[in-house]
Amino acid sequence: MNNNPVVVLGCGLVGSAIVKDFALVENRHVVAVDISRENLDALPESDRITVRLEDVSQPGKVAELVADAALVICAVPGFMGYETLRKIIEAGKDHMMAFEPSEF
C-alpha cells in the first residue's frame, strides 16, 4: 500500500472502529468522512486522523473525497451503500465494503 490515506466513508458504529484501527498503523493516515459532526467529534484526536464533515450523497463528492486515497472503505448506512460503492468503483479506487444492505 502506498503512503496515500485510507478514506473511510461513514463513521458510525462500524466506520469509527475502522478509523481507530487504521490510525494505529504506523505511517498510515486516515481520512474520516461523515455527515454527522457528532460522529466525527467522537473519534479520538490523533495526528493520523483527518475528519471531513461531508455529505457523500452530493453529486461529485465521492470522487472528490477519494481522489488521492490508497484504499476506500465504504461504511455508510445500508440504504446508501450500493450507490456509494458504485461511485467508488467508477473512481477506480481499491475498496472494501463495511455496510449491510438495509432491505432485510
Residue ranges and their predicted role:
Residues 15-16:
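N-terminal Rossmann-fold NAD(P) dinucleotide-binding loop
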Residues 66, 70-75, 95-97:
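N-terminal Rossmann-like NAD(P) cofactor-binding module of classical short-chain dehydrogenase/reductase
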Residues 54-68:
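Conserved Rossmann-fold cofactor-binding substructure of NAD(P)-dependent oxidoreductases
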Residues 99-104:
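Rossmann-fold NAD(P)-binding glycine/threonine-rich loop
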Residues 6-10:
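Conserved N-terminal Rossmann-fold NAD(P)-binding element of oxidoreductases
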Residues 39, 58-62, 80-84:
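Short acidic active-site motifs
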Residues 27-44:
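NAD(P)-binding Rossmann-fold cofactor-contacting core
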Residues 22-23:
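Aromatic pocket-lining residues of Rossmann-like dinucleotide-binding sites
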